[in-house]
Amino acid sequence: MSLFDIEDIKVKPDIVCTYPDPTVPPDAAIVIDNGSYHCRAGWAGKDVPSLVFKNVLAKPRKDRSKKDTSEVVVPTVQIGNDITNIEAVRFQLRTQFDRNVVTHLHVQEQIFDYLFGRLGINADGCVPHPVLLTECVANPNYSRMLMSELMFECYGIPGIVYAVDGLLSYRMNGGQDSGLIVSCGYQATHVIPVLNGRMVEDKVRRINLGGFNMINFMFRLLQLKYPVHVNAITLSRAETMIHNYCSFAYDYTESLRNWALLEFYEQNVIKIQLPYNQNVSAPTLTAEQRLEKRKELSRRLAEINLRKREEKLAEDKVLLTRMLAAEDTLDDEDNVGFTLHEFSVKNVDEYRKMIVTLRERIAKTTQKMNSQQTNNQPEEKPLQLLQPPPNMTIEEWVIETRRKRDEILDKKQIRKQRKQDLAKRRTAAAQERMRIISHLAKKEKGVDDFGMRDEDWDVYKSISREGDSDSDAENEKLIECEEILKQHDSTFVEPVVAPGNIAEFHQLHIGVERIRVPEILFQPSMIGVQEAGLTGTIDYVLKLFPKEDQVKLVGNVMLTGGCANIRGFKERLSRELQAILPFQSVYNLMVAGSPSLDAWRGASQFANSQEFKQSLITRQLYDECGGEYFKEHTASNFYYPTPSQVSSALNDTFN
């Protein structure tokens, strides 16, 4: 059992890099790994990217209250690491991706502006460097065409090369001519077969699951488990928990059985301490202090009542003076109706009766106020102190009361400990319970007289899991003892709630969720996705090839992508491969050296190769052949021309 403080992701805004970079050639290419989770950008030939940031932007909504002002206010757009608190702008986040395909080019343009600006490129209206840009497997021609149009028309780049991130990572890790790539991304997971140095694109398969689904699953599980802490459980914190504490189970079914055991749970559960404000408890008041406090409250209440009486008395006197002054008009028939209406009475008799009532009320209130002034102290009921029996002194009575209280607390603690012991399998209490049960079961069948004797109740209590419960009489006796000690024992301290209990209330227990969340990659049905898991997809892809090619593929299986960082992935997939391959098959499984970063590193190496120069789509080719023109290479998608009917329909739609 381990306790950890919650870790909130803290990012620092990116600085503007020096341009031109003295460590790279003047014509060096810009390498951009445009992932749906992180964007990594830097110069070709370097080992690490210059920029790594979340591939999102936050655009605040316009303030509608200022729509009538003549001054145009443009909301500030935050991009990448400029978003220091992503949860504060969660509902304002925008991304250029629809799953893993770039579809929102206006968002992509703003992110590229941020990227080139942070790289320090300050050329006049253009980016004078070729670009290597990653794209998803089987990226649609139309999406690539819009990206080329953005790059050439908006940024004026001299050339661009498109490559698949999984193939670049495979290349970085010394990929052989044949192998099987399992690329686990943020939005999707791809199984990519490679034969003779090229991807077999028509046999690639995709699972619509990735890191995003794991984060969302953990987020919903914890909110369902701890509804009282629903505001403290955020997507960012769920993401951190997956990175730090989750792992793939080698045998998921067996792991579930282990987590059902209390001992295993207590040894392996992760406790996450949420932030909370600890209220400082007020000091315990003595009997004299409580009495003084009651007197003070009574005095304040008396002052409030006196003030109300004075206000009411003044109102009554003013009303009586007005009525006496208007009494002479009652004999005038012309004014009597107006006078009665003014004082809301029906006739003259009711008017005179109201005057008598006011005089009596004024006299009574004045008399009560005079009596209070003579005796300012309100009458207090004496504090009823509990007294000892006639045959005991107070000191003896306090000692005896303390002893009784300790006995009651000891009994309650013994019952609590016994319940905990019975919950475990190998404790002495649990073994004694099983011995008694087995002894009772050995008795011959006949007349069941268990319970006829008083001793049977003791046997029942000894084998009952619940044990004795705290009786009401016992609790009342405990309260009485504590009240006596409060009044007569100056050393007695009233028990208060320990701060540790408050801290435990603000803890999250990450138990079976540690293996349950990553398991969705192998069992998508756990979150309602009707697709095959990773094992079934790999098995399906392998069966698309003849046996001799299957041997080549399983001889070099590589895991890459952010999800490959989760512990136990290699061991679990190795077990699954052993189950689906023929008996005594030989296979080799490896994890990329840096699953998250190797795609950019492979792109950095590729951008320095001769193949990059041969695969470059230049501005001249773009102008001559159009935005759909594409050059294939060993780390790229295959080019399939868009049918003419579809092309004409797209042109009619967007022209």
Curated annotation (Swiss-Prot):
Places the protein is found: Nucleus
InterPro entries attached to this UniProt entry: Actin (IPR004000), ATPase_NBD (IPR043129)
Cited function: Proposed core component of the chromatin remodeling Ino80 complex which is involved in transcriptional regulation, DNA replication and probably DNA repair.
Name this protein carries in UniProt: Actin-related protein 5
Organism: Aedes aegypti (Yellowfever mosquito)
Disordered, as annotated region: 368-387
Biological process according to GO: chromatin remodeling; DNA recombination; DNA repair; regulation of DNA-templated transcription
Gene this protein is translated from: Arp5
Keyword Transcription: yes
Record carries keyword 4Fe-4S: no
GO cellular component: nucleus
